A protein has these predicted regions:
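Substrate-binding N-lobe of the ribokinase-like
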Residues: 8-75
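Conserved phosphate-binding/catalytic loop of the ribokinase/pfkB sugar-kinase fold
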Residues: 41, 66-68, 78-115
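Short beta-strand/loop segments at the ligand-binding rim of alpha/beta enzyme cores
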Residues: 132-141
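Conserved phosphate-binding/catalytic region of the ribokinase-like
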Residues: 148, 174, 178-218
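A short beta-strand/loop micro-motif in the catalytic core of glycosyltransferases
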Residues: 158-165
């Protein structure tokens, strides 16, 4: 926790420090497992990642496809200011060292009814999307953390595209909810679009069907 975000060339004292296991993939796998879904988590951790694997397993996630590679696991350094806003710096680590052979092996485990859930934290994503599509595996993709590379991914082969307002602006080169959804419908008409709006809820759109769901206070 910091009074404000650190600036270039500045050293700033923090008032609190906490360390948590996480990453979008880990958090989503655990959430799905707790909701009663059978989850098989595939990916890579570094030599420091034994506790990450244990955390997944302790929450009912199948970790048989999690590989250990040399080096460090992925990390995020998050600054939180006094208003609760955050600023995040990511180190990809092992998340960026998945091997093509391991990817193919993981996708070969898919059975009828399975769904592939992806985020933009790992390497070889175009290959993964193409390979999963070839195997007729439905794909759910969240492009966070957003990067220019996403614009060249085969998004036309994604079944569900989940994104927030900022990511939507980058994907569509448009501002405003309606403009973002309109452009993405034109460019990726096969995708079912899910636009998350924080405290304002979420919008689902596929073709002419558009559904808005309010956020639930927690």
């Amino acid at each position: 926790s910091v009074e404000r975000f650190v600036q270039s060339g500045e050293t700033l004292a923090s008032s609190d420090y906490q360390q948590f296991f996480g990453g979008k993939g880990l958090n989503q796998s655990i959430a799905l497992a707790r909701a009663g879904v059978q989850v098989l988590h595939a990916g890579s951790v570094g030599s420091d990642g034994h506790n990450l694997i244990s955390t997944l397993a302790d929450n009912g996630v199948d970790v048989s496809l999690v590989n250990e590679v040399d080096g460090a696991s992925g990390h995020a350094v998050i600054q939180v200011d006094k208003t609760g806003e955050n600023c995040i710096m990511l180190f990809g680590g092992a998340n960026q060292r998945n091997q093509e052979q391991s990817i193919s092996h993981a996708l070969d485990q898919a059975q009828k009814g399975d769904i592939l859930l992806l985020q933009n934290e790992i390497n070889h994503l175009p290959l993964i999307i193409e390979s999963a599509s070839d195997r007729k595996i439905p794909i759910v993709f969240n492009p966070a953390p957003m990067s220019d590379a996403v614009l060249n991914y085969p998004l036309d082969k994604v079944d569900y595209l989940i994104f927030n307002q900022t990511e939507g602006e980058a994907l569509a080169s448009q501002r405003g909810t309606d403009n973002i959804l309109h452009r993405l419908r034109q460019e990726h008409h096969r995708c079912k679009l899910v636009l998350t709006l924080g405290s304002e809820g979420v919008i689902y759109q596929h073709g002419e069907q558009k559904i808005r769901v309010d956020a639930v206070p927690t």
